[in-house]
Amino acid sequence: MSHLTPQEARLILATHLPQPPTDLPTVTLLDLTDADPIACATFHPYLVHCAPHTTTYLVTLQFSMPPKGDAPLTAPNSIEAQYKLLSALHTHLSSGPPPIPLPFPIPIALNADAPRPYILARLPALLPPSAQLKQLSAVRGALPPEQAASLDLRFGVALRAQHNLQSEWCGPPPLESEGLYSWQETFTRLVDEALCAAEAADIASAEDVTALQGYLARAIGAFLFDDVEVPSLVALTTGAGSVFVTDTDGEPQLALLLPSFAHLLYGDPLLERAFSPSEVPSKALLEGYGAPPPIVFARQRTKRMWYDLYLGLVMLLGAGRVGGDQDVDWAAQLVERSRVLLRDAPCY
């Protein structure tokens, strides 16, 4: 597997830009940790810096077709679906001035017919080649509280802006043609498929899956997931690891929010990983997100347990498809903790 070369990057820019740079650009792989192993194996994001340094581009390169396995709805979105959703998000954000500059990539072009299909986008602000992007999850602990709070606040504002993009149908792109309008029906289908695939892959025992399906029936009977009137654009895996900061001005700035396009879907905003107790969402993040907060009642905490279970299963199933030594201990712990908590979790 060869990475994107400066020569390839220059050709991509020359294909899609009216005035492409003539000098060879600088290309750096955007390092993602604690992310979906199958998405990381299938798609690689690269930062492309041009001289003179007026714009920084983001090229998402597809290395292989995502294997679907026994749970096709948990597989990464196609690159065409990713571009369609990213474009819809950009159109939505452009429809009105945001309260603060939002760090989402701005789509430029899709080439699904290239030997290695790609999405070309640009960063909303200039990023010098010397700037180092670091994940918020990696640097937050070393920041002064006021700086960490400022970054979390902006993260919350950006999440709310993303979730304000809504749809008439629920689920990932493969379900669009079915026009499902009930989030409860949609999520039940997603999690049941994941549970059955986890049992087949020896990720979960038959006994545990049967018990969880019983808990799910109880939740459905209590209409636990039926409070989502209009589904929002959520990315499932977006947390502090999706937020990239830089300190080019001497103070950490939120430079890029890269939601996992591979798992974008329309559903419950609470599905976003940023709201998982395992992420320890800060007061500043929730303040930036605004009202209504994602969790108010006990039943919403139970919903988040189900979403943690689903997140963990999707990651473990993805790791199984990729093979090799994948760091998914956190996902296994998430599944086990959710399994235990859901046994007695209230649905009312």
Regions found by a protein language model. Give the residues of each.
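ATP-binding pocket architecture of kinase catalytic cores
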Residues: 32-185, 193
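Active-site Asp-x-Gly
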Residues: 229-233, 245-305
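Active-site activation/catalytic loop segments of kinase-like enzymes and analogous catalytic loops
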Residues: 269-295, 308-326, 333-342
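An alpha-helical support segment within catalytic cores of ATP-dependent transferases
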Residues: 9-24, 109-113, 119, 141-149, ...
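Membrane-proximal envelope and lipid/glycan-remodeling enzymes
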Residues: 2-3, 32, 48, 61-72, ...
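Conserved N-terminal boundary motif of the eukaryotic protein kinase catalytic domain
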Residues: 23-35
